[in-house]
Design a protein with these regions (language model features):
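Catalytic phosphate/metal-binding cores of nucleic-acid and nucleotide-processing enzymes, i.e., regions
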Residues: 1-109
């Protein structure tokens, strides 16, 4: 039975520079390969990011307008397989979720 995986981008499948210059983000290939394998196994992959949400004080419309094309291009360039890219995730220091898992625990590092 397939599952739906919602995956963060920055700090999860890529490293990003201080100050959040997303164009300088570097892919973490090993992690992308794990997510791509889940995709290949028939699971649904959704990337969900807070890119721009802090900068635009929670205005998802501005974050989407500014960062959607850049982010989509990066995911494609990095070879990410996915079904959906969602911007507008609220910016936070801590996310509490009954279905959440820490990225280091998930990827085993």
């Amino acid at each position: 039975m397939s599952k739906t995986y919602v995956v963060d981008i920055d700090g999860t499948i890529c490293d990003w520079e201080p100050g959040r210059d997303y164009t300088l983000s570097r892919p973490i290939t090993e992690r992308i390969n794990v997510i791509n394998k889940l995709y290949d196994e028939g699971n649904i992959i959704k990337y969900y990011t807070a890119r721009g949400m802090g900068r635009f004080k929670g205005r998802s419309d501005k974050a989407i307008e500014t960062f959607h094309a850049i982010t989509e291009s990066q995911l494609d360039r990095w070879g990410c397989k996915y079904h959906q890219l969602i911007l507008g995730k609220p910016s936070a220091d801590v996310y509490i979720d009954d279905k959440g898992i820490n990225d280091n625990d998930f990827f085993g590092n």
